[in-house]
Amino acid sequence: MYCSGHLIRLAGRLEIKTSGVVVREWIHPEGKAIYGVDEAGRGPLAGPVYAACVVLDSCYVINGLADSKQLSEKRRASLAEQIKQHARAWAIASASVEEIDRLNILQASMLAMRRAVIELMPVSNALILVDGTHVPQLDYEVQAVIRGDSLVAEISAASILAKTARDAEMLRLHEIYPIYGFDRHKGYPTRVHLDAIRLHGITATHRKSFAPCAEKSTV
């Protein structure tokens, strides 16, 4: 049903989609193929928003899956590698800063989620479980799960992949715009970041639709 070695294009690069279920409070519906979806990067003032979709392998348990925000950077990186190696399928997608400013951050997040799900071409009995209260428009059965990144292993895994992919992108952007400190705050509105915006203006990777950036000139 799923094959290892499929290629996923992400921001002009190719990533490998290789072929866990950790049961917590969530009981998986019988006869459904579960696809977990989550996003990363709704709150920052800069950078794209990322999303991931993950199908876990019930024959391989990945220990320690949790909401990515509750994990250390080192632990997230380790789990991300395990997910990529042992999940039945996974995909990562993003929506650009331009799309965020044009659509708004919620709709851009939904767009990134939709792209990640579509990459996997879900089977007919798929159930797409999405963290939070909003779900993307898809031609599949979709269900929102509040605190899903803490309750559903597939969503936890998606949270980890989305977060690590976005953090890697912010480190790349730090090399281009080092004075903003993206390597430390990943684009979030910390005092260091806000001070840098006040001193230097904004960059092409800042979200002009977000209030702290709206009236600043671009460097």
From Swiss-Prot:
UniProt keyword Ubl conjugation present: no
GO molecular-function annotation terms? manganese ion binding; RNA binding; RNA-DNA hybrid ribonuclease activity
Binding of a divalent metal cation occurs at D38, E39, D131
Q: Which reaction does it catalyse?
A: Endonucleolytic cleavage to 5'-phosphomonoester
What InterPro entries does this protein map onto?
Answer: RNase_HII (IPR022898), RNase_HII/HIII (IPR001352), RNase_HII/HIII_dom (IPR024567), RNaseH-like_sf (IPR012337), RNaseH_sf (IPR036397)
Q: What is its main location?
A: cytoplasm
Q: Where in the cell is it found?
A: Cytoplasm
Specify one Pfam family: RNase_HII
Which coenzyme or cofactor does it need?
Mn(2+); Mg(2+)
Keyword Hydrolase on entry = yes
Arranged from A to Z, the UniProt key words for this protein are: Cytoplasm, Endonuclease, Hydrolase, Manganese, Metal-binding, Nuclease
Annotated RNase H type-2 domain ranges read: 32-219
According to the UniProt entry, where is the signal peptide?
none
What PROSITE patterns is this protein classified in? Answer: RNASE_H_2
Q: Which domain of life is it from?
A: Bacteria
State any GO CC term: cytoplasm
GO process annotations (BP): DNA replication, removal of RNA primer; mismatch repair
* Cited function: Endonuclease that specifically degrades the RNA of RNA-DNA hybrids.
What protein family does this chain belong to?
A: Belongs to the RNase HII family.
Per its record, how is this protein called by name? Ribonuclease HII
Starting at the broadest rank, the lineage of the source organism is: Bacteria, Pseudomonadati, Pseudomonadota, Betaproteobacteria, Nitrosomonadales
Gene designation per UniProt: rnhB
